[in-house]
């Protein structure tokens, strides 16, 4: 059983023609219950996750000129374990076997990103983003030392960090008006996206 009830509020304000700020707050009430009955060991039980999440977000935009802008974003998010990750079933897969961990905890994420956007035209884009993420109780799949050899899931540390850069390009190869103006334009666009994460 998985129930998540959410509420969200946001406000946007333009201080000047160049500065825009957006504030948001999301509330999630999480209620997860997993019942299990492991035949091999005769183990029956259930596992529950009941949490209240308050998830703020902040986005600032500064327009350098008509074609260039800077954006700064900060937010909090989370990751919940899947049902198979928190129940002690043994899963037999094609490439590996795995078993859940009833003691697994959700992960909290604190996100920060800085983005530069350049719009040569209203429908074209070149952007560069630098991002950083702090993860509390990160979840990872690990190998368990045993005769059978299987994988399980653990909160592998108190915290972990992820950082990187991302480049996005969206370019119109051609734009041609159609004979009937009501149908807009025929166009062919090329999109490229690449990331470096460390």
Where do the PLM segments sit?
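Residues that define the transmembrane beta-barrel architecture of outer-membrane proteins
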Residues: 3-5, 50-54, 108-112, 159-165, ...
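Surface-exposed extracellular loop regions of Gram-negative outer-membrane beta-barrel proteins
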Residues: 31-36, 66-111, 130-152
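Signature of Gram-negative outer-membrane beta-barrel scaffolds
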Residues: 1-65
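Residues on the lipid-exposed face of transmembrane beta-strands in outer-membrane beta-barrel proteins
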Residues: 7-13, 58-62, 114-118, 130, ...
